[in-house]
Regions:
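C-terminal regions of RecA-like/P-loop NTPase motor modules
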Residues: 1-27, 218-317
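The Walker A/P-loop phosphate-binding site
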Residues: 2-106, 122-123
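Generic beta-sheet signal
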Residues: 54, 130-134, 177-179
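Conserved inter-motif catalytic segment of the P-loop NTP-binding fold
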Residues: 59, 70-71, 75-168
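Conserved NTP-handling cores and scaffolds of large molecular machines
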Residues: 16, 60, 75, 79, ...
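Catalytic phosphate/metal-binding cores of nucleic-acid and nucleotide-processing enzymes, i.e., regions
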Residues: 54, 77, 176, 294-302
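Residue-level signature of catalytic and energy-coupling elements of molecular machines
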Residues: 40, 55, 96, 135, ...
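Phosphate-binding/switch region of NTP-binding enzymes
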Residues: 155-274
Length: 317
């Protein structure tokens, strides 16, 4: 009986259409693409996973696209290929250059409709592009809707498209791409005014990583009349994971309007949390140095590359 079962299983494995593998097969292994921000890489267990779908969602203007751009920048730094599917027609080469993205080497598509968007993504996956960003699900318009009059508005047209098309797209992740989909949060109609995402529930069902982004406070500089908002604290929460990471935990990183995420301050905050930098009131101690105020600590590391590299090594080893 055992021999019969063994023979039957062996025969099944010869049928390539069944796509059978043992659980420890290399087919199921995947690498990660880091954000390059210590607290975020810790939260996500090393970054965005390849061969998986990551959904980044939140209100408008909280840094969702910026986070995706940092993944692209890190892929390009290691010689990989990246693509941006721009359904919102918002691609700005100057802004992405400021985000350290190698713009001339980035594939940018602005499809005419939702079907064309998904077909482009499928072909890019099959071509082995390392990371593909869809910005955004909210901008997907099916061809049947796009070709009609503006008054044509069938019920749940966007959700129906995403629910039926996303499962067809995901098998192509086997070619090795990291697929990042960005979506907006909108207030639903009704007395409860709950936040929801356009595109239906399939996106959250099939996502391997679900990152929620929101603004948790402003960063001000100056005093009195000269005080102005220069950025905000970006809170990133891992709402769901099928691939490790600190599920349901969140991190807060400083985002400056002119320069994106403040990497130096991000390292400092992580070091304070891990007690590598000791804070006593307004004073901060690191090794033999003692300075006053967070800006003082930042200045210390900005003026001393060797000291900053020492801090980075402590946080990454």
């Amino acid at each position: 009986m055992k021999k019969t079962a063994k023979d039957a299983i062996s025969q099944l494995f010869k049928d390539k259409d069944l796509n059978l593998h043992f659980g420890d097969s290399e087919v199921f292994t995947y690498s990660r693409i880091p954000f390059g921000i210590p607290s975020l890489d810790k939260l996500t267990n090393g970054g965005i996973p390849k061969k998986k779908l990551t959904l980044i969602y939140g209100p408008t203007n909280v840094g969702k696209s910026y986070l995706a751009s940092q993944v692209i920048a890190n892929v390009q730094n290691s010689g990989g290929k990246a693509a941006w599917i721009d359904t919102e027609l918002s691609w700005d080469a100057e802004w992405f250059s400021k985000c350290n993205v190698d713009v001339p080497k980035t594939i940018v598509a602005q499809p005419n409709n939702a079907e064309q968007s998904f077909d482009t993504i499928r072909k890019l996956m099959q071509a082995g592009v390392d990371v593909i960003v869809l910005d955004s699900i909210a901008g997907l318009v099916p061809e049947t809707v796009a070709e009609e009059e503006f008054s044509y508005n069938p019920m749940a047209w966007q959700a129906r498209f995403v629910n039926s098309s996303l499962p067809k797209l995901l098998p192509n992740l086997q070619y090795g791409s990291a697929f990042i989909a960005i979506n907006q949060v909108r207030a639903s109609m009704g007395p409860t005014a709950l936040d929801n995402m356009p595109g239906g529930l399939a996106q959250t069902f099939f996502a391997h990583f679900l990152l929620q982004v929101r603004r948790s406070g402003w960063i001000d500089e100056g005093e009195g009349k000269n005080k102005e908002k220069v950025g905000f604290n970006m809170e990133v929460r891992l709402r769901k994971t099928k691939v490790g990471g600190e599920n349901w935990k969140s991190v807060t990183v400083p985002f400056r309007v002119e320069g994106g995420i403040d990497i130096v301050e991000s390292y400092i905050r992580e070091a304070i949390e891990r007690k590598i930098i000791i804070q006593t009131g307004a004073w901060y101690n690191y090794k033999d140095d003692k300075v006053m105020g967070l800006n003082g600590v930042k200045q210390l590391f900005l003026e001393n590359d060797e000291l900053f590299n020492s801090l980075k090594n402590e946080l990454t080893t």
